[in-house]
Amino acid sequence: KYLEGFVREDGGIHAAETTHKNYETALGLVCFSLANKTGKYDAIIKKGDAYVKSMQWGVSDDKQASDFEYGGAGYGKSKRPDLSNTSFFLDALKATGNDENSEAMKRALIFVSRCQNLETEHNTPPFAAKKPDGGFYYTPAAGGSSQAGVDEETGALRSYASMTYAGLKSMIFAGVKKDDPR
């Protein structure tokens, strides 16, 4: 009942003045999906699913698959995407019934793959080969960023645990198989 008070007409599930619409809506969708035993929240879930998908980079903007922002989710349309927001976005997609064949999941996997310190056919940004430890960092967008900093020796964006968890979980949700080199 409490969470219903945050449902917006446009499908968002968030506080009125928040800058964290993606995070809040994603968590709200997970909650409503878990509580939807009788179908009571079907309409909220459907609108919320469309809402989070509209926030994904590459949907209603001019970003192409070759752009580092493509497929990611951020704090809002004007903010750069990052792996933390994209991970929550994928939680919402999974909770609302999207599988690896969903176009939104496919786009997100492109972004998630680019957050990994591992050069593959799916990941060719300049950071990927500098320190190929297989871990993940915050974002390849806007020149790249890691909350763990830059490796002084190689210039690589450092991988760190919370983003590596987010990246691995996101890849599993997006259907990456265990024999995939990523």
Regions found by a protein language model. Name each.
Residues 1-182:
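Preference for long, amphipathic alpha-helical scaffolds in soluble/luminal domains
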